[in-house]
A protein has these predicted regions:
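Short, low-complexity, intrinsically disordered N-terminal peptides in bacterial proteins
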Residues: 1-4, 226
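ABC family nucleotide-binding domain
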Residues: 4-215
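Short amphipathic beta-strand/extended segments with alternating polar/hydrophobic composition
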Residues: 73, 225-226
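H-loop (His-switch) and adjacent beta-strand-loop-beta switch element
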Residues: 212-224
């Protein structure tokens, strides 16, 4: 039995004024449990694709479906709710809030989900334990290494149990040792059936993931499963 489709892009293009085409007829499906790399050089369209997958931008033409819903048919409010419920984001620069502990930063991922404060704290602690940081819950960002900050960011993306985690260059700001540790964590989360799309320019990272989607000039050049 095939896994349910989490996200589907159907003939998606994105153009900007001046005749710039960032995406050109992109078709892509991500099934539950997938761990894939979307890889390509600078200017290949990866960032635009990330924004459209994350519903932060809409295509000029084509259809984006998340959990079977056409996002273009949703009001801004319903789209925001879908994004907050179905998607988790991990960024290269972590985007943690200074002055908040690791647990408090993770709990912010539940602020708009109507989760009571006590439950937010409990779920934040569980998410941090899941990424190996149960012992750092009370530490603030300036007390954490780069690798630990990225683990906190991953915990924040996971805390509301999204259908899909979008990770934008998650090892890009890290040294090789911390980058390898974060990649190992993503592989471990994949074993737990977390669905993750990693956007990267790094061919070595892409080669270690079970599925690789290659982009160039706004188009998908190929898709390989290992």
């Amino acid at each position: 039995m095939s896994s349910p489709i989490v996200l589907a892009l159907e003939h998606v293009s994105r153009s900007y004024p001046g005749g710039v085409t960032a995406l050109d007829d992109v078709c892509l499906t991500i099934a539950a449990g997938d761990l894939l790399a979307i890889v390509g050089p600078s200017g290949s369209g990866k960032s635009t694709l990330l924004n459209i997958m994350g519903t932060l931008d809409l295509p000029t033409t084509g259809t984006v479906r998340i959990g079977g819903q056409d996002v273009a048919a949703l009001s801004d409010r319903r789209l925001s709710a879908l994004r907050g419920r179905q998607l988790g984001f991990v960024f290269q620069q972590f985007h943690l809030t200074d002055g908040l502990t690791a647990a408090e930063n993770v709990a912010t991922g539940l602020l708009y989900a109507g989760v009571p404060r006590k439950q937010r704290r409990l779920r934040a602690a569980e998410a941090l334990a899941r990424v190996g940081l149960a012992h750092r819950m009370r530490h603030q960002p300036h007390q954490l290494s780069g690798g630990e900050k990225q683990r906190v960011a991953i915990a924040r993306a996971l805390v509301h149990e999204p259908a899909l985690v979008l990770a934008d260059e998650p090892t890009g700001a890290l040294d090789s040792a911390n980058g390898a540790a974060v990649l190992a964590l993503l592989l471990e989360l994949h074993k737990e059936n977390t669905t993750i799309a990693v956007i990267t320019h790094d061919q070595d990272i892409a080669a270690r993931l079970p599925r690789q989607v290659s982009m160039r000039d706004g188009r998908i050049e190929g898709s390989v499963r290992r």
